[in-house]
Amino acid sequence: MAGKFSFSNFFGMTEDEDYSTDLQGTKTTDEVSPTSRPDNIISMTAAGNAKMNKIVLCEPRIYSDAKKVGKHLLENKAVIVNFTRIEGAQASRIIDFLTGTVFAINGEIQRVGEQIFLCTPPNYEIDGNLSDIIDQNDFDSEVN
C-alpha cells in the first residue's frame, strides 16, 4: 500500500495536511485476557434471576383501602385503581392520598378511564395518553 492516503487527493482537491492519514503503522490488535470479560456481557444466571415487575388491580370500597394501594406503590408495583364501587367523595379523597403518595416516591398517576387511574412507581414509564386515543376514535367514528 502507499505510505499516505489523502482525502483531498482522492476527491481531486488540493493537498490539505489536516485530512491526510498515515496508513502504515496503524495496525493494532486488541488482545483480551482469558480472565477478563467485556462489560456488555452478562451472566445467564444473573439474567434468569431478574425480578418481574407487577401490576396490581384494586377496587377500593372504603377510604382505608387507599393504604393498601400505597403499600403496593412502595413495593415498586404499579397499581390500576378502579373507583366504580365507591362514592365520589370517597374516591376523591383516595385520589388525593394517592397523588401525594406518588409525588413522594417520584412516581406518576394518570387517568386511564372514567373512574380508573394508573399509579406507577418511578421504575415504570407511562408512554402515551389514553384520552388522545379515545378522542381520535371518537373523531374517526364521527367522520365515517
UniProtKB/Swiss-Prot annotation:
For bias kind Polar residues, which ranges apply?
21-38
> Which controlled-vocabulary keywords does the entry list?
Cell cycle, Cell division, Cytoplasm, Septation
Alphabetical list of InterPro entries matching this protein: Cell_div_SepF, Cell_div_SepF/SepF-rel, SepF-like_sf
Q: Which Pfam families match?
A: SepF
Q: Does the keyword Zinc-finger apply?
A: no
Task: Name the predominant localization.
Answer: cytoplasm
Where is region (Disordered) located? 21-40
Q: Which GO terms describe its biological process?
A: division septum assembly; FtsZ-dependent cytokinesis
The subcellular location is:
Cytoplasm
Q: Which domain of life is it from?
A: Bacteria
Report whether Nucleus shows up as a keyword of the record: no
* GO cellular component terms, A-Z: cytoplasm
Biological role: Cell division protein that is part of the divisome complex and is recruited early to the Z-ring. Probably stimulates Z-ring formation, perhaps through the cross-linking of FtsZ protofilaments. Its function overlaps with FtsA.
> Tell me, how does this one assemble?
Homodimer. Interacts with FtsZ.
Protein family membership: Belongs to the SepF family.
Record protein name field: Cell division protein SepF
Q: Which species does the entry assign this protein to?
A: Latilactobacillus sakei subsp. sakei (strain 23K) (Lactobacillus sakei subsp. sakei)
